[in-house]
């Protein structure tokens, strides 16, 4: 079960585009799924814009959290840390509407493999949210299986979260404990 309509699958030769999936899976209910957390939805208010921009211009998770992060960084957090920026902070959400989703994307797997080959003591910990549709765990698994990384020095763990694993009391405590464990030389996935 894919969640998208039979018509969509036939029209696209059984291939499901990531952006299309988020727009199609709850389309019958008039909703789009968040890229950053598949548990969050928003109404498909502007079908034409939703189709053209594939939801990058308006995301349920970004709508919920970006304002707080922006306010914390510009109004409270930076002064407490005694950080003074010589330029204005520009919120990422301002770029969504102009995002070029067709721009070529590279992979960092080769660079990671090279770095780990050159540094025999280097270890890598992948932490992913199960509901993250932005950096999907399937890509991590593919990288782990095909990038030639030294498997004895790579760990992976999934969390009950979206893209921002650190949101939520339970998640942040688990992630912090796992990072501490990793730094101490242990495998947090075990």
Language model features with spans:
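C-terminal subdomain of alpha/beta-hydrolase-fold enzymes, centered on the catalytic histidine
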Residues: 1-189
């Amino acid at each position: 079960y894919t969640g998208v309509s039979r018509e969509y699958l036939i029209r696209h030769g059984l291939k499901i585009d990531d952006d299309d999936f988020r727009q199609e899976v709850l389309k019958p209910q008039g909703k789009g799924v968040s890229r950053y957390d598949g548990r969050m939805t928003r109404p498909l208010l502007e079908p034409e814009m939703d189709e053209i921009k594939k939801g990058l211009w308006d995301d349920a998770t970004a709508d919920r959290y970006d304002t707080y992060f922006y306010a914390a960084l510009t109004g409270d957090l930076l002064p407490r840390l005694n950080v003074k920026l010589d330029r204005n902070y520009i919120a990422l959400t301002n770029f969504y509407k102009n995002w070029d989703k067709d721009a070529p994307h590279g992979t960092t797997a080769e660079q990671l493999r090279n770095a780990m080959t050159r540094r025999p003591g280097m270890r890598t910990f992948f932490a992913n949210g199960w509901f993250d549709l932005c950096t999907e765990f399937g890509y991590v698994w593919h990288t782990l299986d095909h990038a030639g990384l030294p498997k004895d020095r790579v760990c992976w763990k999934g969390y009950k979260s979206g893209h921002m694993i650190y949101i939520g009391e339970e998640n942040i405590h688990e992630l912090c404990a796992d990072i501490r464990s990793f730094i101490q030389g242990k495998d947090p996935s075990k």
